[in-house]
């Protein structure tokens, strides 16, 4: 007997005339907006020009979405390339299906090329964006709730998630795009919620550790990767959705273990301390210093590097 449950949304798609409004896409967009806002504040706090963040996002977001989709299609190819499958579905990104590692790799490469073009160091930006990325991932996981996907085995725990029988306008079974009939097909472990909560925990840890230990030179990003993969490793083993297996083990479990080990090694190999504003962006630091000297009221303006943690270059 299930004492209590978490209901799923009755549907994940609404229509404004002929235009579909998909909750999955809205959650991703919300995560991106929050990530850009937070990264601007954090990058400015390190001495960087916050305007660079939006420019970086313009190249990172589309590259990340493409990379995430490619990774998903490759690692879950059985969903798109089988006797009864339609390969065209591989392009239907609004139906869900983005692999975080593909997004990080291709999005990261796009940002790396952008920063190389700008002749700026990548590490300070990577450290600034890391907590924002994990927070955006948590927000994006809400899209899985609307899509009724990425859940675990059946259970009767008080926080079990109800999976509804959804149908389209023709009465055909449509678990992602349909509307609930009210029939509960199963109560399952809400693994999307477990990952959402884990992501929020890692976000808080990164913000605290960055401020407490003055992390820099890419160490915040390495800590993000290690923290996320640690949680993904055990959550992945709870999921029951179809997945590619290697030696009977889900491929994302293997990837998480390998990447976790690599991130830990990199974290301890990277240089300690944090970059000065002059190291983050010499040109912007010089312009801020010049503005401070030229302040009409005689009061110095905030220096590059004074931001969300209240630091000054002298305290780094």
Curated annotation (Swiss-Prot):
Chain spans, region Disordered: 292-316
Pfam families xrefs: LGT (PF01790)
Coiled coil (UniProt feature): none
Gene Ontology cellular component terms for the protein in this record: plasma membrane
Residues holding a 1,2-diacyl-sn-glycero-3-phospho-(1'-sn-glycerol): 141
Membrane-spanning intervals of the chain: 18-38, 47-67, 95-115, 188-208, 251-271
Subcellular location: Cell membrane
Top-level division of the source organism's lineage: Bacteria
One of the protein's GO biological processes: lipoprotein biosynthetic process
Entry keywords, A to Z: Cell membrane, Membrane, Transferase, Transmembrane, Transmembrane helix
Gene Ontology molecular-function annotations: phosphatidylglycerol-prolipoprotein diacylglyceryl transferase activity
Known pathway: Protein modification; lipoprotein biosynthesis (diacylglyceryl transfer)
Enzyme Commission no: 2.5.1.145
Keyword Transmembrane (UniProt): yes
Membrane topology reported for the UniProt record: Multi-pass membrane protein
Summary of the function given for this chain in its UniProt record: Catalyzes the transfer of the diacylglyceryl group from phosphatidylglycerol to the sulfhydryl group of the N-terminal cysteine of a prolipoprotein, the first step in the formation of mature lipoproteins.
Family assignment from sequence similarity: Belongs to the Lgt family.
UniProt name for this protein: Phosphatidylglycerol--prolipoprotein diacylglyceryl transferase
């Amino acid at each position: 007997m299930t004492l209590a449950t978490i209901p799923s949304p009755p549907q994940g798609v609404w229509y404004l005339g002929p235009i579909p409004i998909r909750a999955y896409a809205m959650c991703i967009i919300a995560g991106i907006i929050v990530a850009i806002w937070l990264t601007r504040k954090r990058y400015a706090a390190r001495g960087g020009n916050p305007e660079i963040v939006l420019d970086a996002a313009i190249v990172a977001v589309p590259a990340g979405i493409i990379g995430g989709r490619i990774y998903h299609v490759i690692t879950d190819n059985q969903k798109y390339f089988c006797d009864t499958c339609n390969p065209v579905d591989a392009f239907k990104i609004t139906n869900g299906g983005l692999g975080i590692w593909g997004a990080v790799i291709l999005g990261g490469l796009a940002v790396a090329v952008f920063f190389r073009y700008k002749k700026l160091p990548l590490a300070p930006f990577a450290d600034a964006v890391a907590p924002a990325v994990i927070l955006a991932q948590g927000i994006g996981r809400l899209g899985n709730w609307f899509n009724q996907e990425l859940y675990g085995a059946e259970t009767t725990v008080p926080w079990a998630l109800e999976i509804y029988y959804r149908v389209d306008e023709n009465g055909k079974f449509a678990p992602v795009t349909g509307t609930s009939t009210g029939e509960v097909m199963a109560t399952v472990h809400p693994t999307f919620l477990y990952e959402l909560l884990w992501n929020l925990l890692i976000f808080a840890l990164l913000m605290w550790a960055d401020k407490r230990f003055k992390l820099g030179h890419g160490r915040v990003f390495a800590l993000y990767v290690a923290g996320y993969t640690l949680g993904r490793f055990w959550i992945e083993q709870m999921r029951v959705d179809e997945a590619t297996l290697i030696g009977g083990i889900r491929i994302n479990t293997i990837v998480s273990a390998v990447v976790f080990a690599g991130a830990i090694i990199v974290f301890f190999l990277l240089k300690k301390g944090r970059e000065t504003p002059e190291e983050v962006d010499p040109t912007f630091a010089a312009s801020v210093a010049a503005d401070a000297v030229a302040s009409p009221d005689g009061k110095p303006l905030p220096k590059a590097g004074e931001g969300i943690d209240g630091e000054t270059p002298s305290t780094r």
